[in-house]
Amino acid sequence: MMDKRRTIAFKLNPDVNQTDKIVCDTLDSIPQGERSRLNRAALTAGLALYRQDPRTPFLLCELLTKETTFSDIVNILRSLFPKEMADFNSSIVTQSSSQQEQKSDEETKKNAMKLIN
């Protein structure tokens, strides 16, 4: 039976590349036992983004700095996927408002029960 496992290796150069330095610093801050798991997850997440648009992981990688915020990442995703992000945002707003309506209805019922009892 053939072993189908694959070893993936590449070098990071933190002295030359700022993104590589951020990656190395982050990996150094993680317990050694968790690093392989994070490396695998990061590769898988990058490939998931690549499958949506091959530019995505490269843009995120190139624009990563110590100051990169979640909002910066969302803005990059908005520029690459304007329709999908707009659809995503509208579904969140719809969910949020219907959840608020449900909470309001529940609160009204509770208040009514207090008046009855």
From Swiss-Prot:
The keyword Coiled coil does not apply. Disulfide bonds: none annotated. This is Protein StbB. Residues 92-117 are annotated as: Disordered. The keyword Transcription does not apply. GO terms for biological process: plasmid partitioning. Pfam families: Plasmid_stab_B. The lineage of its organism: Bacteria, Pseudomonadati, Pseudomonadota, Gammaproteobacteria, Enterobacterales. This protein is thought to be involved in the control of plasmid partition. Keywords: Plasmid, Plasmid partition. It comes from the Bacteria.
